[in-house]
């Protein structure tokens, strides 16, 4: 069992004005693929390094497989780590690079050979075993680094931004390779990235962090559909969610968002619990994703109550879609529309959106109101 339990974990560096990681609580199941995601400096890599034993835990307790590991040396934690830099020995062949850690542990030669060749087969680098790192592409070098971790047969894989040095095309293919590798090895993976696309496409669950604090832990779909606050809503999704200034109004049993003259009626099934009663007359932030805004005639006809007149600042053709960068009463908005859209730079365009896709956030706390 390679479950991981992080209980009230803190990392406090000497002289720091605030903890780098604050009250980190997380239960990771055996064989789960967990992603730590957030902007630079949010504490994700520091947390990973505490799991690895490369950083001391300031407060709290950490368990791997039910065993307290706070004071266990990295070599005894049954983990393997893959870094952003491949850290391959340039004078050694691929075979020797993969085998090096096992040789240091005095593993029998026949066992080393078996593990190296098994890893090479899984990673499709059998034909590269006699080459030196300088003869390899970036993707091949990353596979060698993964192979070096694999042969240890660890209970937990820790991957710290392993694809950051690769170009966009190679990152896409390597994402797929790592997902396949996780399924083949059936071990616990913890993957750190600042790239929300990697997070959304790879993880069983995602831990979103900001300023050393967990913001939300959830499945990719739930993070997208039900963000707990404005930070998560804006960080997950590309282009990011639009935020408009509004005021909650109520007429009879109908709640609406007043966007400065344009009333957006909210679906009654989303407001029936009375959560909005305390917000009537108060300002809120209304969120709507770019993909939920459209100027297509059929969509417009379906959502006649949720339409806005906007000004097109920039129309960006992306091939399969167009990004419209819009201005609405001082608010900047982005819409992802079909390539058949006729909207162009400088045009006034009327757009609609699905009210069921509307998110509302408290102006002061930035927490979600409806979810």
What residue ranges belong to the model's regions?
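A short, flexible loop at the N-terminus of ABC-type nucleotide-binding domains that lies
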Residues: 1-6, 12-23, 72-73
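ABC ATPase nucleotide-binding domain
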Residues: 5, 27, 63, 350-352
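The feature captures the beta-strand-to-loop junction immediately N-terminal to the Walker
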Residues: 37-39
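Helix-to-loop junction immediately C-terminal to a conserved catalytic motif
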Residues: 52
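Conserved coupling/switch loops of ABC nucleotide-binding domains, chiefly the family-specific signature
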Residues: 58-61, 111, 211, 245, ...
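Conserved ABC transporter NBD signature motif
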Residues: 60-68
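ABC ATPase nucleotide-binding domains
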Residues: 74-231, 235
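Glycine/charge-rich catalytic "coupling/switch" loops of P-loop NTPases
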Residues: 254-311, 341-371
């Amino acid at each position: 069992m390679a479950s991981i339990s992080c209980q009230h974990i803190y990392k406090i560096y000497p002289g720091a004005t605030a903890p780098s990681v604050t009250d980190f609580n997380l239960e990771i199941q055996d064989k789960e693929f967990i992603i730590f995601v957030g902007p630079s400096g949010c504490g994700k890599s520091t947390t990973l390094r505490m799991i690895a034993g490369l950083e001391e835990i300031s407060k709290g307790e950490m368990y791997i497989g039910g065993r307290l590991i706070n004071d266990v040396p990295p070599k005894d934690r049954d983990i393997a780590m893959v870094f952003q830099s491949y850290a391959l020995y340039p004078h050694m062949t691929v075979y020797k690079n993969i085998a090096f850690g096992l040789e240091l542990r005095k593993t029998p030669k026949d066992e080393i050979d078996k593990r190296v060749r098994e890893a090479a087969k899984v990673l499709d680098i059998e034909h590269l075993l006699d080459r030196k790192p300088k003869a390899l592409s970036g993707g091949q070098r990353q596979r060698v680094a993964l192979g070096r971790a694999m042969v240890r047969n660890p209970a937990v894989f820790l991957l710290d931004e392993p694809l950051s040095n690769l170009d966009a095309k190679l990152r896409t293919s390597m994402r797929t390779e790592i997902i396949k590798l996780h399924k083949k090895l059936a071990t616990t993976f913890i993957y750190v990235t600042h790239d929300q696309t990697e997070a959304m496409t790879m993880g069983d669950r995602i831990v979103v962090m900001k300023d050393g604090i967990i913001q939300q832990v959830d499945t990719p779909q739930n993070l997208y559909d039900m963000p707990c606050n404005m930070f998560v809503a804006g960080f997950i999704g590309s282009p990011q969610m639009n935020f408009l200034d509004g005021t909650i109004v109520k007429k009879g049993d109908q709640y609406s968002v007043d966007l400065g003259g344009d009333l957006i009626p909210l679906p009654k099934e989303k407001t029936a619990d009375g959560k909005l009663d305390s917000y009537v007359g108060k300002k809120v932030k209304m969120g709507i994703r770019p993909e939920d805004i459209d100027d297509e005639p059929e969509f417009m006809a379906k959502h006649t109550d949720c339409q806005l007149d906007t000004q097109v600042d920039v129309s960006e053709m992306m091939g399969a879609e167009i990004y419209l960068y819009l201005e609405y009463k001082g608010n900047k908005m982005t819409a992802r529309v079909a390539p058949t859209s006729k909207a162009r730079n400088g045009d006034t365009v009327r757009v609609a959106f699905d009210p069921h896709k509307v998110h509302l956030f408290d102006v002061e706390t930035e927490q979600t109101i409806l979810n």
